[in-house]
């Protein structure tokens, strides 16, 4: 007799697993993490093993997936597409190998090991070398006919190569979406207003279930073959590795990571290696599949109800787990972006304790409907910040209310605003907001910006909180005394400890002044009262007496190194400086493009936003962001302060000649984004007046008489009726004229001395950085490449050049030393 509780539990587990199967396999909308599904399946499997009468024919332990969706016709698999048993620990893998060695009598059998892709399993059927049908796994016995969609995948051969294939061949494999392609697709989807894909796995599954193959063809899907189903008798195999080799020969892509390993040690070593590189792979994997390589051994091992005994999936630690949202807080970034963050009940995800996860923005919270108190699925992959990916609404407690963005910044109290059509809310406090100042400074000193080594996040927070540093320019006024004072206070865990440590550096009246500072900030020196929470910050904000630092009692080398690093950063390149400013939408690539095109900070900081569209790959949104930044008096003052403190651009140069075509009147009209003014209409309007201010004087009748269509003519005249637009047009024309006057003559532009030449730089240059040298060479037409080849025109070799110099010698590539480079640059900078 089966006890009631196990029977009820088994029924509940079956119901929940079947519901999860339906959402996962049919709707492509997973409701629970894979780890939760695996736990429930193992629990049900254990119950059915203990009480065999509980097992039912439709139990999830007996079947692979769910019944097929009704949108596609059914395909019955000639050879069932079975699932694999899972191993979650090394002992389970050892037991898997032990069973095989005991049955086959081999001490170290060979296994085929390969990553387990997180995609959609499919079966491809070929007759006489021609692809005739493709189907999903479905429930393992019956799948969905997705032939038309699979034909759109370029990685699936429509006709097999060579002539050794069997007359009938079923190939099993995985359709997946590479992560870079997934991210690129979503970027385009957002720009075009399409629905974004939730994750690569859902993207692959949903793409194959599109009723319109044209939609599938737009999705970046790939395929790897990993086995076979039905095969005609005219071809036979002896091992799984032989099967994979044949599949490659017939034109199927097979994972290059497949390896033949031996015994349990080989399996676990492979697992460790793949676990190490997992997050660097261009596709998602959730474990490793081990298959006994010898086919006769596979036959002898046989099957259990739902899986082969000769194969197993060794799963990685789960990258998704469920937990509870305890609070939703707002973090303020360097550009003022207000990012909601979920504070979570601590949970282990991929081996790391996660206590918070990003919610990205308010729209994402609304889409997921995340509420405080909800049970959510949290995902963490590699170094990626943990994120909430789904809400388990069935577990929502009663009475929880929808979340809304607060109207005030939690740091400075300024209004939080959102521009029309934008996804991001921002604190309007700008540099008056301490949170934005901290993030702006952290970005400014980062390695790819001004590269100030030794100034960490904690130090930046203390410098800002203590009002020692108000902006990035203040870094260049930091003194050894200020930094040592900072270290002395922060190392002291209590006021008493601070006074004790201070005796090594100050005595007499100055020591009494320090005691008075502590009393002023609320510290009871008798030790009986409570210590104020922020006493260290308050002490640092006070006016200190002079200290005679005893260098034997306090470390000073770190402070000296930091001041030296700050001093070195005064000499920088234009692209580094622009990137360091932290303008919205301006990353390294955009900063480099701006520096290459305009060449001079004095030019860039005066330009109106439309002229930034002259730079390749900069559109209206980015151009407006740069223009807005440069139009703010506080930002111009910050640049002035940096220049005043000795920051110098070492690679300034005239604007590039390629700007000329972007500075015509027709181009300026396009850049202004006036409604109804198409590129063709802009060319027409440019024939009516030589400059923007003169074109602004044309009235509607004059435009109509000149043949300009009514909608365009009316839109233009209405646009010029705005005083702000008139002012913008005049400023734009003036800056355009200034740029044109500074451009190289057309003759010189066509005779760049390094046009078409590939140049490699290696080693350290004494007179300028390699970045600066590369920029100067690019201005003269060179293409800078990273490796030496026969096509390399010349190699610039500084100190400690390394292997590139050896390769250049071997290939007889021309080699320039620094003196020759400087002579060349000086020769052409003078022209």
UniProtKB/Swiss-Prot annotation:
Listed cofactors: Mg(2+); Mn(2+)
Gene Ontology process terms (BP): DNA repair; DNA replication
InterPro entries associated with the record: BRCT_dom (IPR001357), BRCT_dom_sf (IPR036420), DisA/LigA_HHH (IPR041663), DNA_ligase (IPR001679), DNA_ligase_AS (IPR018239), DNAligase_adenylation (IPR013839), DNAligase_N (IPR013840), NA-bd_OB-fold (IPR012340)
Cross-referenced Gene3D superfamilies: 5' to 3' exonuclease, C-terminal subdomain, 6.20.10.30, BRCT domain, DNA ligase/mRNA capping enzyme, Helix hairpin bin, Nucleic acid-binding proteins
Domain BRCT: 749-831
Binding site for Zn(2+): 409, 412, 427, 433
Active site: 116 (n6-amp-lysine intermediate)
One term under GO cellular component: cytosol
PROSITE patterns listed in its UniProt record: BRCT, DNA_LIGASE_N1
Catalytic activity: NAD(+) + (deoxyribonucleotide)n-3'-hydroxyl + 5'-phospho-(deoxyribonucleotide)m = (deoxyribonucleotide)n+m + AMP + beta-nicotinamide D-nucleotide
Gene Ontology molecular function terms on file: DNA ligase (NAD+) activity; metal ion binding
Protein family per UniProt: Belongs to the NAD-dependent DNA ligase family. LigA subfamily.
Function, in words: DNA ligase that catalyzes the formation of phosphodiester linkages between 5'-phosphoryl and 3'-hydroxyl groups in double-stranded DNA using NAD as a coenzyme and as the energy source for the reaction. It is essential for DNA replication and repair of damaged DNA.
Protein name: DNA ligase
Gene name of the encoded protein: ligA
